[in-house]
Amino acid sequence: GATLGSALVYTVGGMLLLVVRKPAPISEYPRKYLLVGGVMFVLYEAFISLAIGLASTSVQSLEVSLVNYLWPTLLVLMTAAFSHKKGAVWRALPGAVIATIGVSLAVGGEDFDVNVALQNIVSNPLPYLMAFAGAFIWAIYATVTPSMSNGYDGTTVFFCCVAVTLWIIHFVSGQGLPVQAPSVWGFVAVFTCALSIAGGYACWGYGMLHGNMETLALGSYATPILSTTSGTVLLGVALGAPFWVGVILVVAGSLITVWIDKRATKHTA
């Protein structure tokens, strides 16, 4: 099941992070950061896992993933809003819209149909609502928690909390452990997924605390592109024209945002 797979991946990932990025003693973390950041981190992961699990078809799973990938756009806009620069949101909006269209093309490809998507949302709205809520929560998390952290990175702690939450959801939903033990390749798949996801979150957490948030927000558009690329390579599927058009739009949207912002900065200097 979806929850079992996610729980296994996050359990292994949490163990890896405990070894590689051992957290500071809990008592040293700011309480507000632990509470607000921890709740948002766990809610995001729980919402996304449940949203994908509640999707009734493969098409709905794709559409739910697209809704989830609104988080880079929301992050760009929120970062602009919290930058306290006059008109920053309006300057970020054109590039954000172009990049979002690019993400939709790159991830959805030729299989994405707006009319079908609207029908699916009406017939099964919960996974779409959860995916959008998750995207919104993650954008808020990335925007507001660095200022609460006092330099502490709670990624490892939050990741382990997600693993516990997913196990609770799995057993409460009436699902038990599998009757048959996974194959060797099953264990390899879990470990590989855990390594990539935990590594990605570790890098993201470090970037939030030590990098430029505006640059990180723009760079986040690469996440769905890289995810789609790796998936198609693993499945041996050729990348079609919509993907490459989408990539061009993502790059163009990001460059437009940078150009408009630099132009505005020159005029105000």
Report the location of each language-model feature.
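Hydrophobic/aromatic residues within transmembrane alpha-helices
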Residues: 5, 51, 81-84, 148, ...
